[in-house]
């Protein structure tokens, strides 16, 4: 190694050491001035020898050119959300569900952490070097924020220590301490810039800057709390031990992580954190409780978009008092009439609130609410403002009754309320402009047909100008017609037309979700698509046949049956197909008809695969007649163990289940 290379390596190592002591251990051993001197020396040497600059150098946190837009990154392992509980009774019910699923009455060890009020991000390290960072996005696809994350000084550009995996994706929260938030807003007021409502918004705005030099000026910080991709290495068998390993590698971890061995200890931890909340120096909105054992986590598995082994125990939402100035009625996608209180604006949990949902007529009656009342407002889950109660002692003499409409406020169609349902609905269907707008917005949304560039304002204009009445009309739009909309130039119009053309190629599950059938969300749409295979089979299914689909009960089955029984809905579907909306035809072959070593077997994949992605491997196995399961049990016939296989492999060996490696799988697949 040349002397200059040796000098650069030593400087970088020294600076990383001091960054680790300062940001992770909170124990700096040199004054800031000495750190700054070392950094200046490194910058000087790198400017003289630019060919020796490395991407993990401490100088490379700042300096990338501004972006014109964020590119998308698909998460190799989905970033799931957590289910919430809001009181001790609900947490104890969660604990009971976990015990019941494990068929055990023994106390569990939980790893308890702060629920930070920031932005969830994933950071990918390859051979210890930071290579990529992304936002959570919709859990499947996020935005590439690598350049911005590199500017956050608490996040190491290079991990240090031994046994670092070849590929390690850590998940965590980027947030803004309250002191930094106040400093940003103080500067914004002084210069006439944007003043943020709360630290979370400020963190989001800082992290999503197209110019990373702006992000670098914001005092963002980070705590890691989990792992996504893991290849070419091993991690400890408990969540808490993994966090300690992360810390040893230089990643920042909250010092409030605590192991609790009984439900009572969890509740004590929750109360203590709630008591300390005002003094932490950063915003949290609860605590996260996770089963500590990775083996038990795998056994518990997931439901829909959340794990069964973890829950967010949210703090009671912050409350304020204000006055109801009026009550208006909004019409949703399925015709639901929702009363909305128009409030005297008031700050609640750092957000200026001027509207609050009243849910339905029963809720108004329960509250005894009148227009003009003084009310208590709560941000439920710190997100959706709600009216909690009426301050009857301060009711003004001129308070007015809330009169629920008998006709739709948008299209004047009759409003009906089905017996047994709390929600009143407009009967206008797609002749109702409000329902039409919301249905179309749902149809083009990211998780449905995902029409890039077609936002809410475009849909509003298309409906108001009567260019579009049904989803099929969207595919008949021309660039010329779109150019007539506000703020829509020829290039933007053509981009929307191109996006519509691209959206015609979809999946059966996305198509079903896009149709907006009542009570049919993404998971149910996927289950229906997998069970019936074709649109024709689903359209002809009886209520009884629909209930044979996993997790489909009488309510969902009835809504689905009624949707396809409605002639106007069938007409819209026919028009969509005529416009070219399509998806791959399923290949359905009975397992007993397949000549394959996997036919009819229940197979579990574990560990990392090098020759196929996990999704590809699953698809190949299913095509050969296998049923691919997520966990090992006595019903498992075969376990395929890739690199760094963990507790699933151990359980398979314990149960005496046949185990093969990836090479043998590829041989049996015919590769």
Swiss-Prot record:
Top EC class, one word: ligase
Active site: 115
Annotated ranges, domain BRCT: 593-671
Binding locations of NAD(+): 32-36, 81-82, 113, 136, 173, 290, 314
Cofactor dependency: Mg(2+); Mn(2+)
EC identifiers of the protein: 6.5.1.2
Biological process terms in GO annotation: DNA repair; DNA replication
One GO cellular component, as annotated: cytosol
Residue ranges that the Swiss-Prot or TrEMBL entry lists as coiled coil: none
PROSITE patterns recorded: BRCT (PS50172), DNA_LIGASE_N1 (PS01055), DNA_LIGASE_N2 (PS01056)
Reaction catalyzed: NAD(+) + (deoxyribonucleotide)n-3'-hydroxyl + 5'-phospho-(deoxyribonucleotide)m = (deoxyribonucleotide)n+m + AMP + beta-nicotinamide D-nucleotide
Amino-acid positions noted as binding Zn(2+) in the UniProt annotation, renumbered to this chain: 408, 411, 426, 432
Record keywords, A-Z: DNA damage, DNA repair, DNA replication, Ligase, Magnesium, Manganese, Metal-binding, NAD, Zinc
A GO molecular-function annotation: DNA binding
Family of this protein: Belongs to the NAD-dependent DNA ligase family. LigA subfamily.
Physiological role: DNA ligase that catalyzes the formation of phosphodiester linkages between 5'-phosphoryl and 3'-hydroxyl groups in double-stranded DNA using NAD as a coenzyme and as the energy source for the reaction. It is essential for DNA replication and repair of damaged DNA.
Protein name according to UniProt: DNA ligase
Species annotation: Klebsiella pneumoniae (strain 342)
Gene responsible for this protein: ligA
């Amino acid at each position: 190694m040349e002397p200059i290379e040796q000098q650069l390596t030593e400087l970088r190592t020294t600076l990383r050491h001091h960054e680790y002591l300062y940001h992770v251990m909170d124990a700096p051993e040199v004054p800031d001035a000495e750190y700054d001197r070392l950094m200046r020396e490194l910058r000087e040497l790198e400017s003289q020898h630019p060919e020796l600059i490395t991407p993990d150098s401490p100088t490379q946190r700042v300096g990338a050119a501004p972006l014109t837009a964020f590119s998308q990154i698909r998460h190799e392992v989905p970033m799931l959300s957590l289910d919430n509980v809001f009181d001790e009774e609900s947490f104890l019910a969660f604990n009971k569900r976990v015990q019941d699923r494990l068929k055990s009455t023994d106390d569990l060890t939980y790893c308890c952490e702060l629920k930070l009020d920031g932005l969830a991000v994933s950071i990918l390290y390859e051979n210890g070097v930071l290579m990529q960072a992304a936002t959570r996005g919709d859990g499947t696809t996020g935005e590439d924020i690598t350049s911005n994350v590199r500017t956050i000084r608490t996040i190491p550009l290079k991990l240090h220590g031994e046994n670092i995996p070849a590929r390690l994706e850590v998940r965590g929260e980027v947030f803004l301490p309250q002191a930094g938030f106040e400093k940003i807003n103080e500067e914004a007021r002084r210069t006439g810039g944007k003043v943020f409502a709360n630290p979370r918004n400020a963190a989001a705005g800082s992290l999503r800057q197209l110019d990373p030099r702006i992000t670098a000026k914001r005092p963002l910080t980070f705590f890691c709390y989990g792992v996504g991709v893991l290849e070419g290495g091993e991690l400890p068998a408990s969540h808490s031990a993994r966090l300690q390993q992360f810390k040893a590698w230089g990643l920042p971890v909250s010092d409030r992580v605590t192991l609790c061995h009984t439900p009572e200890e969890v509740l004590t931890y929750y109360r203590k954190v709630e008591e300390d909340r005002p003094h932490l120096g950063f915003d949290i909105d609860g605590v996260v409780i996770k089963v500590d054992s990775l083996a038990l986590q795998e056994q518990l598995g997931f439901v829909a978009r959340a794990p069964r082994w973890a829950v967010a125990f949210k703090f009671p939402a912050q409350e304020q008092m204000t006055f109801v100035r009026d009550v208006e009625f909004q019409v949703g996608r399925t015709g639901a009439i929702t009363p909305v209180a128009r409030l005297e604006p008031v700050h609640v949990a750092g957000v200026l609130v001027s509207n609050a949902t009243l849910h339905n007529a029963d809720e108004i009656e329960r509250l005894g609410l009148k227009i003009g009342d003084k009310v208590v407002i709560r941000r439920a889950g710190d997100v959706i403002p709600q009216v909690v109660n009426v301050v009857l002692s301060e009711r003004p003499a001129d308070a007015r009754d809330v009169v629920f409409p008998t006709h739709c406020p948008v299209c004047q169609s009759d409003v009906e309320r089905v017996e047994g349902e709390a929600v009143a609905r407009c009967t206008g269907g797609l002749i109702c402009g409000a329902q039409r707008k919301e249905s179309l917005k749902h149809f083009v949304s990211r998780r449905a047909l995902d029409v890039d560039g077609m936002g809410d304002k475009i849909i509003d204009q298309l409906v108001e100008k009567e260019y579009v009445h049904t989803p099929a009309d969207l595919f008949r739009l021309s660039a010329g017609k779109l150019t007539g909309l506000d703020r829509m130039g020829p290039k933007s119009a053509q981009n929307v037309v191109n996006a519509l053309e691209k959206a015609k190629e979809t999946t059966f599950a996305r198509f079903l979700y896009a149709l907006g059938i009542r009570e049919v969300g993404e998971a149910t749409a996927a289950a229906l698509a997998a069970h019936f295979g074709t649109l024709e089979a689903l359209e002809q299914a009886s209520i009884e046949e629909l209930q044979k689909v996993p997790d489909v009960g009488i309510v969902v089955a009835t809504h689905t049956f009624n949707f396809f029984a409605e002639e106007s809905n069938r007409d819209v579907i026919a028009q969509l197909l005529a416009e070219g909306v399509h998806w791959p035809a399923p290949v359905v072959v009975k397992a007993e008809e397949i000549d394959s070593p996997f036919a009819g077997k229940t197979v579990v994949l574990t560990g990392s695969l090098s020759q196929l992605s996990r999704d590809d491997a699953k698809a190949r196995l299913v095509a050969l007649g296998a049923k691919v399961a997520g966990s090992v049990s006595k019903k498992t016939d075969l376990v395929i163990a890739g690199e760094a296989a963990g507790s699933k492999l151990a359980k398979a060996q314990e149960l005496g289940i046949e185990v093969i490696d990836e090479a043998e799988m590829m041989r049996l697949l015919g590769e």
